[in-house]
Amino acid sequence: MNEPEGLRFRRLNRPHIITDETHEPQYKATSTYSGKVFRVTLLTMVAFLLLPLLVVVFVLESPIQPEVFSLNEPPLMTGCYEPNLKLRQAERLFEERLVGPESLANIGDVFYTGTADGKIVKIEGRNIHVLATIGKPPCGSREHEHTCGRPLGIRVGPNGTLFVADAYLGLFEVNPVTGEVKSLVSTEKRIAGRRLGFVNDLDVTQDGKKVYFTDSSSRWQRRDFMHLIMEATADGRVLEYDTETKEVNVMMENLRFPNGIQLFPDEESVLVAETTMARIKRVHVSGLNKGGMDTFIENLPGFPDNIRRSSSGGYWVAMSAVRPNPGFSMLDFLSQRPWLKKLIFKLFSQDTLLKFVPRYSLVVELQSDGTCVRSFHDPQGLVSAYSSEAHEYSGHLYLGSFRSPYLCKLDLSKV
């Protein structure tokens, strides 16, 4: 039907309904803009935070050049290694009066030890006397340790004098009465073309003619021992000092952190704790096998420090860090990841890293053939921490420590 002439048909418009969607385009625009601002701000903050890390990772040089090495899977802590709390039965002695009594020697009831502030002290009853100092003050800090000196291994010789291994200054003989100090081997002297960098422990033959000692590294000093462990540098040596000719000879080299040393009963060989490798080697220093080396015990449940004779004819081995199984061992995990070691040492100091090492203390008694006899534990290091040596005397075990501010005494009849 045609529209009437002169009239126009108008289509009705739908009423305009106002809703919340009316301003949606404007809201979306605002939201998009705010999101962009947020993302840009977030990315800027992330970049700002990551930039120093990237500089550390790609620009800064790591202080260590780690070597790849492998450790066997740690032994299960069962049987002889079964965890217990026996070290918690120990008594702390001279708390806050002795810092870092690493090694111990005794003449009768009188004990001698070296401390973190460079002193060699004499312990009589409840009294501590400073017997001698080898280095020069100031002492007591990492910065001055290399000039102050750090007495580590200590032994009583057949003539009643003390033989002392100072990490920075060398080998010394000390009169236990007068405190007179005599230098035997200086670290200034080159041995087979290399200086002594980290003199650690020693032992003396029964006739006093030979002193065997360990030089843990020619690259790293004692104050950087974590660098040595992490780098796994194989530059440690076992040396022999002849008290008559004054000559020093290399008995064995290319060891990874040779630490504690103990003469075998026949004195034709010495046991050497190879700390980084969690084992004890036997180095032949005289006789038909001189110059040879074999393994006394492999794959220990911890990292061995000093070795000392036990009254049963075996050996006490102190370990300040363990390789728990079941459990997690940081050093085992990192052994085949040198890139991660480098990164860690770019980011953290040695003191910071030590905080991540469990305070688990462990002392193991081994038979003369290396078989485990028994073990004493303090899993959290609540009483005995950072154990470096177990020294047996008169039915008691005296526990030295490279770091703790005390000495521990354990009654063996009660454990």
From Swiss-Prot:
Where does this polypeptide localize? Membrane
Gene3D superfamilies named among the record's database cross-references: TolB, C-terminal domain (2.120.10.30)
What are this entry's molecular-function GO terms?
arylesterase activity
**Topology relative to the membrane, per the entry?**
Single-pass type II membrane protein
Which ranges of this chain reside in the Cytoplasmic compartment per its record?
1-39
Membrane-crossing ranges are 40-60
Please indicate the ranges of residues that lie on the Extracellular side: 61-412
* Top-level taxon in the UniProt lineage: Eukaryota
Query: What is the protein name for this chain?
Result: Adipocyte plasma membrane-associated protein
